[in-house]
């Protein structure tokens, strides 16, 4: 979910619309779970059901991962995917909330199907999207076959991606959520994996979605706050780890934080009972669990392995996959395989 309400505070001058080609030769750490969920929600049939193979296994995530990654590589974007590890205990409440919402959505989906309401069925089918361990492992296998690096985070993927960006190992972190800024990423790119012509939910309307760059330094300077205060604001309005203080929205939180200086004083002034929860979440954003155990190497794709995974195992159309592989190989040769770019892209962690 992330801190969606935080977008209200992002100054317009700190947002920059990008063309995919403008990211050529830039490396980006992409939040894998966030991206795969987008594919699961968006890539569906007319009835709202996800794409499946002959054995009934969901393949929407693989389709999105394969074709969208090729699109990014064709534009010279050196993308690496960062996968979540064990969620922090702080997130237990949020995970339970999401599971309950998915269960409710599944029931409403079945009811809509019985009524013959296609639009409602599609809406609730998207809301009930699930990402299993098996699906995650399939995604990793496909990325390896494509020669695209992936990183296993010890905890939150966004925290790891932000760490990699802060170290300068990648140019930016990419996610639909704003948590990357809270975790200290100097640069966040949104809409990277979903750019292009997209249909609005429940409407027969299409819009052009373009990548958007948000710079942390600009946000802090324009709001006149520190990163610590930005985290305090987020914790007050609600995150994956805190429910948010009742009656406190983004602008009110900004005013309180600037007035009192830090989170603990604001919590005391507001008479918040569960102060420890908010302070624990605050400290987690500032000191998340991350690792240096990763390599960023864009290797030569393995066409036969890709065909085995997509065509033989999951019934993808062989002709279409082979044509996409041709694009992938062309992108690798032209954008990723030169000696100089290999030097630029290789970061071996000690």
From Swiss-Prot:
Enzyme class name: hydrolase
Cofactors that this protein relies on: Mg(2+)
Keyword flag Cell wall biogenesis/degradation: no
Entry note: cofactor: Binds 2 magnesium ions per subunit. They probably participate in the reaction catalyzed by the enzyme. May bind an additional third magnesium ion after substrate binding.
GO molecular function: 5'-3' exonuclease activity; 5'-flap endonuclease activity; DNA binding; magnesium ion binding
Region (Interaction with PCNA): 339-347
SUPFAM superfamilies noted in UniProt: 5' to 3' exonuclease, C-terminal subdomain, PIN domain-like
Top-level taxon of origin: Archaea
Binding-site list for Mg(2+) 2: 177, 179, 240
GO biological process: DNA repair; DNA replication, removal of RNA primer
KW DNA damage (keyword) present: yes
Keywords carried by this UniProt record: DNA damage, DNA repair, DNA replication, Endonuclease, Exonuclease, Hydrolase, Magnesium, Metal-binding, Nuclease
EC number: 3.1.-.-
Region named N-domain: 1-102
Region annotated I-domain, chain positions: 120-261
InterPro entries cross-referenced by the UniProt entry: 5-3_exonuclease_C_sf, Flap_endonuc, Flap_endonuc_arc, HhH2, PIN-like_dom_sf, XPG-I_dom, XPG/Rad2, XPG_CS
Residues annotated to bind Mg(2+) 1: 31, 84, 156, 158
Family: Belongs to the XPG/RAD2 endonuclease family. FEN1 subfamily.
Database matches in HAMAP family: Fen
PANTHER family reported for this sequence: FLAP ENDONUCLEASE 1 (PTHR11081:SF9), FLAP ENDONUCLEASE FAMILY MEMBER (PTHR11081)
Function in brief: Structure-specific nuclease with 5'-flap endonuclease and 5'-3' exonuclease activities involved in DNA replication and repair. During DNA replication, cleaves the 5'-overhanging flap structure that is generated by displacement synthesis when DNA polymerase encounters the 5'-end of a downstream Okazaki fragment. Binds the unpaired 3'-DNA end and kinks the DNA to facilitate 5' cleavage specificity. Cleaves one nucleotide into the double-stranded DNA from the junction in flap DNA, leaving a nick for ligation. Also involved in the base excision repair (BER) pathway.
Assembly, per entry: Interacts with PCNA. PCNA stimulates the nuclease activity without altering cleavage specificity.
Protein name: Flap endonuclease 1
Source organism per UniProt: Ignicoccus hospitalis (strain KIN4/I / DSM 18386 / JCM 14125)
């Amino acid at each position: 979910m992330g801190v969606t309400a935080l977008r209200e505070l992002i100054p317009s001058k700190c947002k920059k619309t990008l063309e995919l080609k403008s990211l050529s030769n830039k490396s980006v750490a992409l939040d894998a779970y966030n991206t795969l969920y987008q594919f699961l929600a968006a890539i569906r049939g007319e009835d709202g059901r996800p794409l499946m193979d002959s054995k009934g296994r969901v393949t929407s995530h693989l389709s999105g991962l394969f074709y969208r990654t090729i699109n990014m590589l064709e534009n010279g974007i050196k993308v690496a995917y960062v996968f979540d590890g064990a969620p922090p205990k702080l997130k237990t409440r949020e995970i339970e909330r999401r599971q309950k919402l998915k269960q409710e959505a599944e029931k409403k989906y079945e009811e809509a199907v019985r009524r013959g309401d296609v639009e409602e069925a599609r809406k609730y089918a998207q809301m009930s999207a699930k990402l299993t361990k098996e699906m995650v492992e399939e995604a990793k296998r496909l990325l390896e076959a494509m020669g695209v690096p992936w990183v296993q985070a010890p905890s939150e993927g966004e925290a790891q991606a932000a760490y990699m960006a802060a170290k300068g190992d990648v140019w930016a972190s990419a996610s639909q959520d704003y948590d990357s800024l809270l975790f200290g990423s100097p640069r966040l790119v949104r809409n990277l994996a979903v750019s292009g012509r997209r249909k609005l939910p429940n409407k027969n309307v299409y819009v052009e979605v373009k990548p958007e760059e948000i710079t942390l330094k600009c946000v802090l300077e324009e709001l006149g706050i520190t990163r610590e205060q930005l985290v305090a604001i987020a914790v007050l309005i609600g995150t994956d780890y805190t429910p948010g203080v009742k009656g406190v929205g983004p602008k009110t939180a900004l005013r309180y934080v600037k007035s009192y200086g830090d989170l603990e004083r604001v919590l005391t002034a507001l008479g918040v009972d569960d102060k420890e929860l908010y302070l624990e979440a605050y400290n987690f954003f500032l000191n998340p669990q991350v690792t240096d155990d990763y390599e960023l190497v864009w290797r030569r794709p393995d066409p036969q392995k890709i065909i085995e995974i997509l065509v033989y195992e999951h019934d993808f159309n062989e002709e279409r996959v082979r044509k996409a592989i041709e694009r992938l190989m062309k992108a690798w040769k032209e954008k990723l395989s030169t000696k100089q770019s290999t030097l630029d892209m290789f970061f071996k962690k000690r």
